[in-house]
Amino acid sequence: MATVLSRALKLPGKKSPDLGEYDPLTQADSDESEDDLVLNLQQKNGGVKNGKSALGDLPEPDSDADVAGAAKPHLSEVTPEGFPSEPLGGLEQKATSPLVSYVRTSVFLLTLVISMVLVLLCAFLIPCPPRDLHSAWSRRLGSQGGGDLSPLELADVNRDGLRDVLLTFVTTRNGTEGGVGSQPTADLVCLSGMNGSTLWSSPLPEEAQDVTCLDLIPGSVAKTICLVTGTRKMLSAFNATSGKVLWTLNPNHLSNGTLAAPVVVLPDLDEDGVRDLVVLAIGELQPDLCFLLVSGRTGSPVGRPVKYNIVGVGNLIGPQVYITASGAVYILFGFGNIQAVALRDIFVQAQNRDSSPPSLQIEEPEWEKHRSVNLSELIDVYSDGVELLQLVKAPDSNSSSLLITTRQGLVLLRGQDLTPHWKLNLQGLRSQPTPGYFTDDQTLDFLLQTQDGDGMKKMTVVDGGSGSIVWSYSIPCHMKETPTTSAITSDQKSVFLFWAEALTAASLSSDDSSGAEPPGLYHLYLLHPAFPSILLDLSNTTGIVTASEVGINDIWKDAFYVTRTTGMSPEGHPTSLVVSKLSLRWALMEGQMVQLKETTPKIGRGELRRFLSRIKFVDSPYQI
């Protein structure tokens, strides 16, 4: 208050004392904060300095007000040192910040909504792969009216990711004309791999000996074609999706013989973009063997028939196509022996010309050395009581090895030079060996079944690298021939499947093959290389198993086992035909463990189940 009174008494225009002198009123003004508040109120209310408005002209530099202002700046005008003063537009920026935040939030929510809509559209427009919900199904196709052959093929005909089942069978239908009686008819049927329902059916003019489904146009997404070879003169191509006939070979081209073996697929010979075919016909006399090249696009012959006079004793071998590492193409065939003829020679004779396509002009020097006579077209491959011939993948090579089943045992020939890799003497071997991976050397091994006394069979696994026996066991089985199959897992091991009668505790501990169950009940057993002392009992049937195939569900890494069984009448004739499917991953969890022998440490069921639950199956062909 003293400061206010002192300033009020001062006359206008009077000079203030010298700044160097001590003024108690001025000193009190600088020490008391209350006076600062009063001055602030005066300035806000438009107070007058030296008779002038605060917004008017600047006061004189030597006025008392300037001296006081210089001694003590106004608090609202003080700017801390090191901090810039706020621009005048700061209020406008603060006012627009809520709008920016609103825009950002709106953009984020809009992006989120669009992403959710796209995800939902993809979920509805792109269907999920169908899951094979049927772990097992069985389909009865009625009474079978004869027929000794049991063709069975797996192919995905409806493009749903699951392989379907194709088979042919003979049925008996009543005659329509006075007392003619019943007459057999053949049918080609396609069953859904999902549930066993019939996708399509097509009649056949005769019984079929083989059904093969493949794509004749390499590297394309064309429709799958099924080639059906009859027992006499029929060769037809079917659209696997619809079951319609695409073409049929004119039987007049086989007037001098009948089809002796299933059709064989060749490279493209007529350069129309579709792989071609060859069939082997046999006349009434054995030496008359005839090769006929057939167009894969139209079913018309590619040239005239080519005849060879072959004399031999034993089973008909082949024909099979062998492509060497250098690209030379040979046809393997024979009677009780194996001979080869270059596809180039067949093509030149069929076309009646001297030249051949460049792809057929390649020769394999090691094979050419085995020609029986100079300038002869036939190459001697093997001639010692041949029963069966298989082409199997050779390790570390882009060619195949020749696995030959003879009356004396088993022989593996190297495909490069036709020299024996190993031989195994084994009597009683009649069925085809089943390839698979049992050992750890990534070389194909083979499961064999041989006769081992009355009502007994011995199952044997042979090492494909050395020809030595690595596993064997005798099982009770009264069926003469039972199919064996295998499936490869993701860790490059194979599971082997075979049929036998019940392996009870009594039959395991003694040589007596009679068990508690009747001999007409057969069980499906699985052998895994990781547990050679254990078999898994997966399923059983009372019928006669005539054919079986293993397919792979690539989407779910599962394998399924398809069987074709027939019942028997009291007179011994086949009756009803049944097709069954079994999911292997499901069966592994539900199967019963059969301990062949005691091991140390003992294998528990929990340990086995944990191991089996991790098994995944993959598609990897053993034969090429």
From Swiss-Prot:
Keywords: Cytoplasm, Cytoskeleton, Golgi apparatus, Membrane, Phosphoprotein, Transmembrane, Transmembrane helix. The gene is Fam234b. The lineage of its organism: Eukaryota, Metazoa, Chordata, Craniata, Vertebrata. Residues 1-91 are annotated as: Disordered. It is found in: Membrane; Golgi outpost; Cytoplasm, Cytoskeleton, Microtubule organizing center. This is Protein FAM234B. The chain crosses the membrane at residues 107-127. One of its GO terms (cellular component) is membrane. It comes from Mus musculus. The modification Phosphoserine is found at residues 16, 30, 33, 63.
